């Protein structure tokens, strides 16, 4: 403690001497090289806190109790969920490859976007050692087949191609750049999507929502307590049902496989060592029968079941984040998110944001300082203004600022800028926020 105090005193003296060499006008226009932010939580903060669900499960709460807590006024009831859901698994790309995995694996190729209910004659059936490369070209998709044991003729392009396989013996391995993902269920469609500027390849996996889709969700660790896994499965099913009514043209999908919607990782979730079976069993426990399962409802209809990783201690009132009131998204205490034992990474975090990123976020030539204009009732920032050395300024909502500078959340407690000066490496601006004092050394 004495050594640290001496170091801080020395740094303060050096910093004061350094400033004496700089005129007041120069000091006022110093442009920070970085900004440091301290905060808590991860995600938008609306709906169910996943860390909170884990914390409550550790306190022996049931899945229904957890869901009723985070979505007050709702009920967990049986609801039909035997629909097919179309999941975008690769988008805005030019090409992708597919292989069959399995000792007796084979793939069946169909020309066109074939509905799951139809079983036409395939364009071709190919052995498991065949690699199929699908390339977008001028608004069409061109398949090219290769194999160490066979030669294939060129195939004419078509707007879309469908691939199926026998899920009892085979999985489909999709390779997009360096990312390779296995899919066990349903079918995969490769389609060319055209917008005003160009065309690109969109790849989708169509499968049953009830079980096949949920088995592949990688939203939380499978090692978590059973009640937390069940709550996650029910919330995810509810969210997905809300996406079924619209096919999005830009992705040829109902839902994305990323955290834009829900993190769908395919067969890898089920095959996790030791714990994969726990997630599958948790999903199964939420079934009511073959064609229906537990869903969060209000007046008999599925809710918008938003969820996120962790909060700054209280979940958000949705009206303060996205502008429209929702009766079951009004915010509740979430102390589990601030427990570092169960939220090691985000109970308290710090991030450096480079000057270039701050300037780009505010669309200013540079940022010398910023002002937090307002906060939500939970303490997260709702409005922030960046100020340039030119005197220009720009204002962003808290959520937009978080997205642009890639901070974990809008629960920002403390900030400081780092300025490179002659004789000193760092400037430390000390702020006391909620009795927390942070300083660089």
Model-derived regions: residue spans:
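Conserved, single-site charged/polar hotspot
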Residues: 2-441
């Amino acid at each position: 403690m004495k050594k640290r105090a001496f170091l801080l005193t020395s740094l303060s003296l050096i910093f004061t001497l350094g400033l004496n060499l700089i005129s007041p006008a120069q000091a006022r226009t110093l442009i920070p090289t970085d900004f440091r932010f301290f905060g808590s939580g991860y995600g938008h903060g609306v709906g169910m806190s996943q860390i909170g669900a884990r914390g409550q499960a550790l306190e022996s709460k049931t899945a229904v109790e957890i869901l009723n807590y985070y979505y007050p006024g709702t009920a967990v009831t049986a609801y039909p969920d035997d629909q097919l859901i179309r999941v975008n698994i690769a988008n805005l790309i030019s090409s992708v490859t597919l292989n069959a995995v399995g000792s007796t694996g084979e793939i069946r190729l169909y020309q066109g976007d074939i509905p799951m209910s139809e079983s036409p004659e395939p364009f071709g059936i190919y052995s498991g050692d065949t690699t199929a490369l699908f390339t977008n070209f001028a608004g069409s998709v061109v398949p090219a087949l290769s194999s160490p044991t066979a030669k294939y003729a060129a195939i004419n392009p078509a707007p879309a191609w469908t691939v199926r396989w026998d899920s009892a013996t085979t999985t489909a391995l999709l390779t997009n750049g360096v990312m390779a993902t296995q899919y066990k269920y349903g079918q995969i469609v490769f389609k060319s999507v055209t917008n005003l500027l160009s065309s690109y390849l969109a790849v989708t996996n169509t499968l049953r929502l009830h079980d096949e889709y949920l088995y592949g969700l990688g939203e939380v660790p499978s090692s978590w307590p059973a009640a937390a896994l069940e709550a996650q499965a029910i919330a995810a099913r509810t969210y997905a049902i809300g996406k079924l009514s619209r096919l999005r043209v830009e992705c040829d999908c109902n839902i994305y496989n990323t955290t834009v919607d829900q993190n769908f990782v395919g067969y890898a979730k089920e095959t996790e060592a030791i714990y994969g079976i726990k997630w599958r069993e948790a999903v199964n426990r939420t079934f009511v029968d073959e064609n229906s399962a537990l869903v969060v409802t209000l007046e008999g209809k599925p809710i918008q079941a938003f969820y996120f990783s962790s909060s700054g201690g209280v979940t958000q009132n949705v009206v303060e984040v996205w502008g429209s009131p929702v009766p079951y998204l009004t915010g509740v205490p979430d102390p589990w998110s601030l427990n570092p034992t169960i939220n090691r990474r985000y109970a308290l975090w710090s991030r450096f944001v480079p000057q270039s990123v701050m300037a780009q976020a505010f669309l200013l030539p540079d940022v010398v300082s910023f002002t937090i204009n307002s906060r939500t009732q939970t303490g997260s920032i709702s409005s922030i203004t960046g100020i340039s050395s030119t005197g220009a300024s720009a204002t962003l909502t808290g959520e937009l600022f978080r997205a642009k500078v890639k901070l974990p959340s809008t629960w920002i407690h403390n900030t400081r800028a780092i300025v490179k000066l002659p004789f000193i490496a760092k400037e430390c601006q000390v702020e006391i926020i909620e009795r927390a004092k942070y300083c660089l050394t």
